[in-house]
Curated annotation (Swiss-Prot):
Name assigned to this protein: DNA ligase
Family listed: Belongs to the NAD-dependent DNA ligase family. LigA subfamily.
Amino acids binding Zn(2+): C440, C443, C458, C464
Metal-binding among keywords: yes
Gene Ontology molecular functions: DNA binding; DNA ligase (NAD+) activity; metal ion binding
Cited CDD domains: BRCT_DNA_ligase_like, LIGANc
Task of the protein: DNA ligase that catalyzes the formation of phosphodiester linkages between 5'-phosphoryl and 3'-hydroxyl groups in double-stranded DNA using NAD as a coenzyme and as the energy source for the reaction. It is essential for DNA replication and repair of damaged DNA.
Residues of the BRCT domain: 623-711
Pfam families in the cross-refs: BRCT, DNA_ligase_aden, DNA_ligase_OB, DNA_ligase_ZBD, HHH_2, HHH_5, Nlig-Ia
Active site per database record: K148 (n6-amp-lysine intermediate)
Biased composition (Low complexity): 10-21
UniProt-annotated binding residues for NAD(+): D52, A53, E54, Y55, D56, S101, L102, E146, R169, E205, K322, K346
Cofactor(s) the protein requires to work: Mg(2+); Mn(2+)
Length: 711
């Protein structure tokens, strides 16, 4: 394990001081080249060429020379990976090329369907030729196959070969600037090897090898610090440290797998050639990859990787398939926010058995009531699980989960633990069935479950502590009461400090109380008080919308305001009266009745009126004609020129109800390309089927307008 440069050990031990600048400059450059080479051998090729002590000697000498000759220090020097002063926060970065997520596949059928769609999109005859052609290696689409790493997605921007920016994926459009932290990761080159393009954005994954994770946790435990539950959390937590000196001490690694912006050179012809090019530039690229043809090639790669998944030195949660030719990727394009040319094939989640000690309900920020199984602790999917979601009451009944049961627990998608099934032969005699409560465990309000909905909800939206923050943010938003300055941070403090419990409490706030909040100066507090004061005068439809009644959006709020004219009439309306309102069906009517039937909500509304919240009232108006009232439509597939949302708006504007599933009560199904099972069911039930042109003709025949004309 000797350095390949002749005389390396002798040079490494030579004193640093006393060298003339010209000689120092040459020595500094040689040391940097040597350290970069050894970093590449160690972190990329996993083939170290010198002992750690010799590497440390080279590094120490370079540090000393740069201290003696500060004019020679450059940002891409290996010594600059140690981290600088702590940050107060991360800046936001807008990705020039969005970092899109991938569609997931979980079965062989998902993979063959993906291959079929790619072949069809590329005009391959094999796609239409049936099963035999689909699996033909000669005719099949060529794919690049690689691992799906369980880490943190990252974008590295190099300009003229030098790392200038690193950003997290974020929401795909914008991420966080973590450049100072990423510069401490030795696996990531600060300067690319060889000729480099003017701009190169490399997409990849920051992760932690299992061996490094174990060592880190051992050090954390020895120091009495918090340990991490899995390598992914350790990697994400390490990378998002505001103090880069902490990141520098964490054993983070990186694999490159994608391309963002590129300037100065032509794009490679294939994805596999791109990865080879990354490796040539000194970027770490995983060698567990292959180029295959057709669906069978994809499935073979998936099974081979699955067989050795546990033996890999890092965590993965699946494999990724991408059409290999970049020109074909462009031809296939994107659907929604995911590429058509790629698929993430997830591994089955790991499963274990444990005992249900209790079943409780949790109240979400929108009032959703979710049964949660309290479990005997069990280690599954890399973490210790003590709770698992049961989703809703129907799922509890369908799975027949009792308190005391032995159940199979799975980490769905390796993230959210869920109860998969009950081991009935182990059910004890004293097992107890779950009973859904009728009152909210947080605020005591009535729990409702609307027709055709699986989720039960707390009706105390204006009073419930679990929904408090969300209710206040909704109340204050621009389209509701328009209270500028009442954002997430302010609401969080107001609620957490017990200052505000309901929207009515907002109108009791003064400048002094608000100015005492974190990051709220007197001027900001004054502006917020003025905005709250201005909101006392509003419109009826804005007030209705601000209440956050389930299923009552802006358009429905306008219809209710026009129809009733006065709040008192709306509050006492029964379902029959509400069904007279344009675009209000049984589900919406029931939701409104339940909301105003909850005394807690009425109490808050009266407090708001007492606080001076007011609006012009008017006399009720006659209901506008709805030519398709009473008709139920179902939309399926992709329409040629209309989005599904636009088609839904047009139908609802004409008075129709748009449902999500086909039944005997369905009047029409509007079908586009790739309609699927809904079309099959419609044909089996004899439900009339329209295409887009037929739907538009029907709307025209009844005199219905375009979407938005009735808003």
């Amino acid at each position: 394990m000797n350095a390949t440069h002749r005389g390396a050990q002798a040079d490494a031990s030579a004193p640093a001081g006393g060298l003339p600048p010209a000689t120092a400059a040459e020595r500094v450059q040689w040391l940097r080249d040597e350290l970069d080479r050894h970093n590449y051998q160690y972190y990329v090729l996993d083939a170290p060429t010198i002992p750690d002590a010799e590497y440390d000697a080279l590094f120490t000498e370079l540090q000393a020379l740069e201290a003696e000759h500060p004019e020679l220090l450059t940002p891409d020097s290996p010594t600059q990976r140690v981290g600088g002063a702590p940050l107060s926060a991360f800046d936001t970065v807008r990705h020039r090329v969005p970092m899109l997520s991938l569609n997931n596949g979980f079965s062989d059928e998902d993979v063959t369907g993906f291959d079929r769609r790619c072949a069809q999109g590329l005009g391959r005859s094999a796609a239409a030729g049936g099963e035999q052609d689909l699996f033909s290696a000669a005719e099949g689409v060529e794919y690049a196959c690689e691992l799906k790493f369980d880490g943190l997605a990252m974008s590295l921007r190099y300009e003229d070969g030098r790392l200038v920016q690193a950003a997290t994926r974020g929401d795909g459009e914008t991420g966080e600037d973590v450049t100072v932290n990423v510069r401490t990761i030795k696996a990531i080159p600060l300067k690319l090897r060889g000729a480099a393009p003017a701009v190169l954005e490399v997409r990849g994954e920051v992760f932690m090898y299992r061996r490094d994770f174990d060592k880190l946790n051992a050090r954390q435990a020895e120091a009495g610090d918090k340990t991490f539950v899995n390598p992914r959390n350790a990697a994400a937590g390490s990378l998002r440290q505001l103090d880069p000196r902490i990141t520098a001490k964490r054993p983070l690694s990186f694999f490159a797998y994608g391309l963002g912006e590129l300037q100065g050179i032509e794009r490679p012809a294939t994805h596999s050639a791109m990865l080879d090019g990354f490796a040539t530039m000194g970027l770490p690229v995983c060698n567990e990859r292959a180029v295959v043809k057709g669906a069978q090639g994809l499935l073979d790669f998936y099974r081979k990787v699955g067989e050795k998944r546990d033996q890999l030195p890092y965590d993965i949660d699946g494999v990724v398939y991408k059409v290999n030719a970049l020109a074909e990727q462009e031809q296939l394009g994107f659907v929604s926010r995911a590429p058509r040319f790629a698929l993430a094939h997830k591994f089955p989640a790991q499963e274990m058995t444990t005992i249900v000690e209790d079943i409780e309900v949790q109240v979400g920020r929108t009032g959703a009531i979710t049964p949660v199984a309290r479990l005997q602790p069990v280690f599954v999917g890399g973490v210790t699980v003590t709770n698992a979601t049961l989703h809703n009451e129907d799922e509890v009944r369908r799975k027949d989960v009792h308190i005391g049961d032995t159940v199979i627990v799975r980490r769905a998608g390796d993230v959210i633990p869920e109860v998969v099934a009950v081991v009935l032969e182990r059910r004890p005699d004293d097992a107890r069935a779950f009973v859904m409560p009728t009152a909210c465990p947080v605020c005591g309000s009535h729990i409702e479950r609307l027709e055709d909905e699986a989720i039960a909800r707390c009706t105390g939206g204006l009073i419930c502590a679990a929904q408090r923050k969300q209710a206040l943010l909704h109340f204050a938003q621009r389209r509701a009461m328009d209270i500028e300055g009442l954002g997430d941070k302010v609401v969080e403090q107001l609620v957490d400090q017990g200052i505000v419990r309901t929207p009515a409490d907002l109108y009791k706030l003064g400048v002094a109380k608000l100015a005492a909040l974190d990051r709220m100066a007197d001027k900001s507090a004054g502006n917020l008080v003025a905005a709250i004061e201005a909101s006392r005068s509003t419109t009826f439809n804005r007030f209705i919308f601000s209440l956050g009644i389930r299923h009552v959006g802006e358009a429905t709020a306008k219809d209710l305001a026009r129809h009733f004219g006065k709040l008192d009439g709306l509050m006492v309306a029964d379902e029959a009266a509400l069904l007279e309102v344009n675009d209000v069906g049984p589900v919406v009517a029931q939701s409104i009745v339940n909301f105003f039937g909850e005394p807690h909500n009425v109490e808050v509304i009266e407090q708001l009126r007492a606080a001076g919240v007011h609006w012009p009232e008017s006399e009720p108006v006659a209901r506008a004609p709805a030519p398709l009232a009473g008709k139920t439509f179902v939309l399926t597939g992709t329409l040629p020129s209309l989005s599904r949302e636009a088609a839904k708006e047009m139908l609802e504007a004409a008075g129709a109800k748009v449902a999500g599933s086909v039944s005997k009560k369905t009047d029409y199904v509007v079908a586009g390309a790739e309609a699927g099972s809904k079309l099959d069911k419609a044909e089996a039930l004899g439900v009339p089927v329209l295409d887009e042109a037929g739907m538009l003709a029907l709307l025209e025949s009844v005199g219905a307008g375009q979407p938005g004309e009735q808003s």
